[in-house]
Amino acid sequence: LQDGAYHEVDSSEMAFKIAGSMAFKEAARKAYAVILEPLMAVEVTTPEDYMGDVIGDLKGPRRQIRAMDERAGARVVQALVTLLDIFGYVGDLRSKTQGRASFSMQFDSYAEVPQHIAKKIVAKVRAQ
């Protein structure tokens, strides 16, 4: 808003609401908007025999292994994984490790969704 002033005849609460709404829409149209997705800090504890399968699962284009340790005779893998990639992971982990691995996660941060995925999301929302 530039050079705004109140005038007893021309100014009203509704006029200011409309002007504010128009300014917000214009700013949103000019802004570079991105879609963000949650990244989860994942920790998998597994027997040594299944380490290769676990690492294979946690590697990928939107997954990042942060650290690998040994704790109480088991291997521990810490990774960052998108929340979308975590859905269904517990079942996959159990089947690949015969139920011997454990898994925990907590929110870590947000990251920008890759452009090719963002375009699909926008197209899907616009189609509704």
Swiss-Prot record:
Top-level taxonomic group: Bacteria
Cellular component terms per the entry's GO annotation: cytoplasm
Database matches in InterPro entries: EFG_III/V, EFG_V, EFG_V-like, Ribosomal_Su5_D2-typ_SF, Ribsml_uS5_D2-typ_fold_subgr, Transl_elong_EFG/EF2_IV
GO process terms (BP): ribosome disassembly
Places the protein is found: Cytoplasm
UniProt keyword terms in alphabetical order: Cytoplasm, Elongation factor, GTP-binding, Nucleotide-binding, Protein biosynthesis
Keyword Protein biosynthesis: yes
CDD domains xrefs: EFG_mtEFG_C
Molecular functions per Gene Ontology: GTP binding; translation elongation factor activity
Family listed: Belongs to the GTP-binding elongation factor family. EF-G/EF-2 subfamily.
Function noted in UniProt: Catalyzes the GTP-dependent ribosomal translocation step during translation elongation. During this step, the ribosome changes from the pre-translocational (PRE) to the post-translocational (POST) state as the newly formed A-site-bound peptidyl-tRNA and P-site-bound deacylated tRNA move to the P and E sites, respectively. Catalyzes the coordinated movement of the two tRNA molecules, the mRNA and conformational changes in the ribosome.
Listed name of the protein: Elongation factor G
Organism: Planobispora rosea
